[in-house]
Amino acid sequence: MNSKQILSLSAFAMTIATAAAGNWNAGDTIALLIGIAMFFVLLLALLGWISRKK
């Protein structure tokens, strides 16, 4: 799997997870934002690691 497939699969999984939640409150919103931020940081770390390997 390349990085584009992983990114699209992760975005799809986040969409399904948010659509499945029935009652949405502030805690869920904060958790979603933290999860997106962590995913973004990990994605950049992975891209940096790959670029240093080459």
UniProtKB/Swiss-Prot annotation:
Residues 1-21 form the signal peptide. One of its GO terms (cellular component) is membrane. The chain crosses the membrane at residues 30-50. Residues 51-54 are cytoplasmic. It comes from the Eukaryota. Residues 22-29 are extracellular. This is Uncharacterized transmembrane protein DDB_G0282757. It comes from Dictyostelium discoideum (Social amoeba).
